[in-house]
Amino acid sequence: AKLCIMNMAVHGLNAKIKSGDEANSFYHDAHNLEGRCDYVMANPPFNVDKVKAESTQNAGRLPFGLPGVNQKKEVSNANYLWISYFYAYLNDTGRAGFVMAASATDSGNKDREIRKQLIQTGHVDCLMSVANNFFYKVSLPCSLWFFDKGKKEELKDKVLFIDSRNYYTVVDRTLNEWSEWQMKNLNAIVWLYRGEKEKYTKLLQDYWTQIINDYKEFDAAFESVSVLLNGYGEKLKPLRVQISDIVKNSEDINQLLPLNDLLKKYSTELNASLKALCEYGDGLEKDEAKVFAKSIDESATTWDRFKKSVSTRIVEVVSQIKACRTVIKEAKWLTEKFGDGTYTDVLGLCKVATIDEIEEKNWSLTPGVYVDVAPVEEDDENFEERMTEIHKELLTLQSEANKLMDTISANFEVLGI
């Protein structure tokens, strides 16, 4: 309890631990929630051990009985205590969603018996596998469980399995996440499984609107900077016309999907135009370069400042184009699988299984057991091109670092240090 209060205080919150110094969900039902909750959402600690079986039994909320008890009269893994609690808290139409250790979907012995009873209620709605590195400092994969006591009658003997382990955005070497649009896509699978096609249709419209707005934003940004390219952006004109025509004539998301390849070419040409401009200016004498800069922008004071300003603005445009391409990529991911909005099992991604099929799999709730292995999807990024870009960028950064070090060394010499 003291640790809990301290944790709340660190986050600037006042707390009252209702169970006092003995606060422990396994041994106390302080809030008396059994059968009272419309919704339950939780991220409990995984794989807790040494839980006293007798105290846990006395605390109740175990509609399917205790998990396995060892010779020391302890529950050696409390995962199915949590799962039982969350189910027990729901009222007759309640819904639950919680994070759980990946191993819990297929654990054996008494866990399997509890899982069997749980599945036979017809209230297990969806199971989702999640990739590694979705938690800070915890690299292990996990699963998301969803219960729904108010499921439609036609879905009661079915469970939706989603394997999202290959679908995520890399934040850095040790952290992954779902982007806003990836979460919407995963939601869309559930909508279609439930027959909520209108939500899917609205999402397609949201994609269309977002891409149109992104286009307007980066096109306006390019318009303001294009004059600064001083004729080096001529190759961009026909591409810009093509892109504009597709956007203006589009009526739905499918008509915008071809933009992805065009925007990739557009970004490449934009970077090439900037490079050509910079190489020309860098090749001039200092005074000539200044005159050249002022001929393009009267407010320019030096070539270096002008180059930095133009480069920064072009990088911003390229970044906006990349963001637009990301939205298009996610729209394509969704529409290629579900078209205008009919649920279908997708190899390696999702599968609706009946309770009979789950029984055949020995009551496993591991999505990968049902969805099978996904086919390898082509990446629209060329590996060799990307590695070349990275190599060039590293060389540029190294060159800039060397110049900076020379400047620092020279300054130290002047200071006599």
Predicted regions and their residues:
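S-adenosyl-L-methionine
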Residues: 2-35
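A conserved structural/catalytic subdomain of Rossmann-like adenosyl-cofactor enzymes
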Residues: 34-413
